[in-house]
Each structure stands twice: as C-alpha cells, then as structure tokens.
From Swiss-Prot:
Source species, domain of life: Bacteria
Gene name of the record: queC
Protein's UniProt name: 7-cyano-7-deazaguanine synthase
This protein's pathway: Purine metabolism; 7-cyano-7-deazaguanine biosynthesis
SUPFAM superfamilies the UniProt entry points to: Adenine nucleotide alpha hydrolases-like
GO molecular function: ATP binding; ligase activity, forming carbon-nitrogen bonds; zinc ion binding
Enzyme nomenclature, EC number: 6.3.4.20
InterPro entries in UniProt: QueC, Rossmann-like_a/b/a_fold
Cofactor(s) demanded: Zn(2+)
Function: Catalyzes the ATP-dependent conversion of 7-carboxy-7-deazaguanine (CDG) to 7-cyano-7-deazaguanine (preQ(0)).
C-alpha cells in the first residue's frame, strides 16, 4: 500500500505542531510548510524549524510572503497594539491578518498538488474560529469546494483534502493530545509579541497558559504568568 503524503501548515505554534503529529501517527509522510510573512513574532519560525526537526518531517519549506508591506494587523504593523484584555466574543480581534489563511492555504494546495499530497493539514481550532473568519468550518468547507475546482487534481477527482482535525477542539484538549503524541511543547511558540521570551499577557499567551494549567503542566507556562 502506498504511503499517503500530507502537507502540514506549520506556524511554530502548538496547534499546527499537534495536527502535524496526528498526521504522522496515521502513517503519513508529512511535508511542513511555514511562512515568513513579516510577523512581529518572527521567533515562531525558529520554533517551526525545531518542531519539524523533532517530528522528523520529510521536508520543511519556509516561504517569504510579505503581508507586512500593507499592514492592517497587530501582527504585521507595529503601529497597531497587541490586545491583552482577553478574547471578546463576536469580535474579530486586531491580530486578524487580512487574507492570511487564504494565501497560506492556496500556497499549501500548490505544494500539495506538486508533491501529489492527498491532504493539507491545518491546525485551526475552536479557539481560533471564535474570533477569526478564516478559521471557521464554513470557510474551510467553501475553500474545499474552490480547491476541487481550481486544481488539475481536483478536476480529475483526486484533489487535496483540507484536513483540520482540531477544528472542534478546545485548547486544553489540544494540549492533552500534544502530550500524548510527544509533541515538543517547550519548543513551540504562541506569543504574539516580538520578544525573545513569551510575554505572558497577550491573548495567545493567556489562552495557552490557561490550557497548560488545566492540563496540569503549569511548569510550561510563560514566565510572566506561571
């Protein structure tokens, strides 16, 4: 039986690392794809490389896509403040990057088709889609339809599947799965700030730290909030 190939979008964060590890557990040959898009938390790319090495991915590519050229997000524009007051239900936060996931998924599908990969692995989850429009199930469902129409493989009936195994999961459940799969949590990076250590106060740090505490591992929390 031929081994299935998957392309995993690998940000360097906990969620994408866990999703990639899940694909590996299913026996996939996994190719990692990361993006240098001008994010202020550039440290996550070092984390992505470390995760790819630890998991033993077949390949790992890092592509430059300068979304900071026009800003529009707290993650790409230093003039926009990183929020620290918690996730507001029903509000799209300033850390949303215009078109980011649309660009990333499109490029991922290109690599997947070039490599003959059956799946594109995405780490989006319930925490993400509560705030970000391009992490929600309805977005992924429609993008899947587009992918099937926009590629040679899709038109021939064997297009790449957008696989988002964490889409209904809480952050705590993701942390627990990461431990089960021996994901190097200490090597991942979630902080939105551009420092060399996690700030402990941005929304991403708060969510990650809360999940780690719920999972019984406060020792892995950021220094500022442990």
């Amino acid at each position: 039986m031929t081994q299935r190939t998957s392309v995993a979008l690998l940000s360097g964060g906990l969620d994408s690392a866990t999703a990639a590890a899940m694909a590996l557990e299913e026996g996939d040959r996994v190719i990692g794809l990361s993006f240098d898009y001008g994010q202020r938390h550039h440290r996550e790319l070092e984390a992505a490389a470390a995760v790819a090495s630890h998991l033993g991915l077949a390949e790992h590519h890092c592509l430059a896509v300068d979304l900071a050229a026009w800003g529009g997000s707290a993650l790409t524009d230093d003039a926009v403040t990183i929020p620290t007051d918690g996730v507001q239900e029903g509000v799209i936060p300033p850390t949303y990057v215009p078109g980011r996931n649309t660009v990333f998924i499109a490029v991922g599908l290109s690599l997947a088709e070039a490599r003959g990969a059956e799946r594109l692995v995405l780490g989006v989850n319930a925490v993400d889609y509560s705030g970000y429009p391009d992490c929600r199930p309805d977005y992924l469902n429609v993008f899947q339809q587009l992918a099937n129409l926009a590629s040679k493989a899709g038109r021939e009936g064997h297009g790449t599947e957008l696989w988002a195994p964490l889409v209904e999961w809480s952050k705590t459940r993701i942390v627990e799965e990461a431990f089960r799969l021996n994901v190097p949590i200490q090597s991942t990076w979630s902080c939105y700030s551009g420092g060399t250590t996690p700030c402990g106060i941005c929304d991403s740090c708060r969510i990650r730290d809360a999940a780690l505490r719920e999972a019984g591992r406060p020792d892995l929390c950021s220094n500022a909030s442990a």
